[in-house]
């Protein structure tokens, strides 16, 4: 990857590059690895924590930050101080890539504007949907107006799904929007990793249908809807015992409400793939993701999926064929879908098989190349003077 006979230089700004092992951070680290392998130079600017969740890829410049109260794993960057601006000027990036619309991202965006550097943003989270989970729904309007200003000030936006790309095209202009989807590691997530002896070791009988929650245990993942669906299924006479894979500050909250759930905590690698493939149905009530990584990984593992009918899921799941989409925020709808799949094992298995086949099309090599094409479009517009003013 070259420009004017030298390596392309990219400055990536992240609110949390490796403090938490979530889908956004894993995607960004994969992207940096991909870019470096192709000869680009990448410099990452991000808050850092004393304890990281995984070894990060690339050179990280620590940005001054403070811990978010009650969520110490996340940090809030304190803007773009002079030392960081000097480092950025010395690196002289050809592109500034913003992965979050936070204070750091907005400060970097303004600096890039003043310096004449093209700005690319990638969408990873629907932050406006978080507010209702923390009693701040009244702030959604101001938040959406801020996000509109942020994305409208970008030269190019990488949307994770076609529905979101269409939404953003209507807001910010279709010529500035392209898709950066996500891939799945088929060696890590595959139906062949299902392990009946592992299920027995957790106390599950062969005939039991095991519903799975897979992801960070935080309220904004829809834990209240998951709990409601399980309790409704039990009230209907099915003593389902969910399997919970993941860790987070809401673990105790969920454990108190679902005392017979089996909590495996945080897993990685083959242990994670085995746990996912050994369940039967993924229930994903989250409406906050921009891309449903857990949906894709569970699909690759051969599970039937019950997911909220939101843009992050509807682009992956062909409802009735590779999974089931249900009205968001309706525990009753999730419970009804779960009960249908418990009653019809042939349909449940057919959904899982079709989902696993569909996941074959989601390859990291191809999705990461989408980012490079987005960079190229942005640079071409900058060269012809058709970028943002």
Predicted features and spans:
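Conserved donor-binding/catalytic core segment of Leloir-type glycosyltransferases
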Residues: 204-221, 227-231
């Amino acid at each position: 990857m070259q420009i004017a006979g030298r390596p392309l230089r990219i400055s990536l700004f992240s609110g949390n590059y490796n403090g938490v092992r979530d889908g956004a951070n894993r995607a960004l680290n994969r992207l940096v690895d991909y870019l470096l392998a192709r000869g680009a130079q990448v410099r990452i600017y991000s808050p850092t924590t004393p304890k990281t969740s995984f070894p990060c890829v690339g050179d990280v410049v620590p940005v001054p930050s403070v811990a978010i109260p009650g969520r110490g794993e996340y940090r809030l960057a304190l803007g773009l101080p002079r030392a960081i601006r000097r480092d950025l000027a010395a690196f002289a990036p050809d592109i500034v890539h913003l992965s979050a619309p936070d204070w750091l991202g907005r400060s970097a965006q303004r600096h890039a504007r003043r310096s004449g550097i093209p700005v690319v943003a990638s969408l990873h989270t629907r932050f406006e949907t978080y507010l209702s989970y923390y009693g701040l729904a009244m702030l959604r309007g101001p938040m959406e107006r801020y996000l509109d200003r942020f994305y409208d000030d970008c030269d190019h936006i990488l949307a994770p799904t076609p529905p979101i790309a269409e939404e953003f095209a209507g807001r910010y202009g279709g010529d500035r929007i392209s898709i950066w989807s996500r891939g799945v590691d088929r060696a890590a997530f595959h139906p062949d990793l299902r392990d009946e002896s592992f299920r027995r070791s957790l106390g599950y009988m062969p005939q039991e249908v095991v519903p799975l929650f897979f992801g960070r245990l935080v309220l904004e993942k829809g834990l209240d809807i998951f709990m409601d669906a399980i309790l409704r299924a039990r009230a209907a006479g099915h003593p389902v015992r969910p399997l919970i894979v993941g860790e987070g500050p809401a673990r105790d909250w969920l454990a108190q409400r679902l005392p017979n759930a089996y909590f495996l905590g945080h897993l990685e690698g083959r242990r994670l793939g085995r746990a996912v493939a050994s369940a039967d149905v993924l229930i994903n009530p989250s409406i906050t993701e921009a891309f449903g990584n857990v949906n894709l990984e569970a699909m690759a593992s051969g599970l039937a999926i019950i997911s909220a009918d939101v843009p992050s899921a509807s682009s992956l799941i062909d409802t009735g064929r590779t999974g089931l989409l249900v009205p968001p925020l309706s525990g009753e709808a999730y419970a009804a879908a779960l009960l249908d799949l418990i009653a019809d094992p042939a349909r449940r298995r057919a959904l899982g098989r079709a989902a696993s086949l569909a996941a074959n099309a989601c390859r990291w090599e191809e999705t990461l190349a989408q980012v490079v094409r987005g960079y190229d479009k942005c640079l071409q517009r900058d060269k012809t003077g058709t970028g943002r003013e």
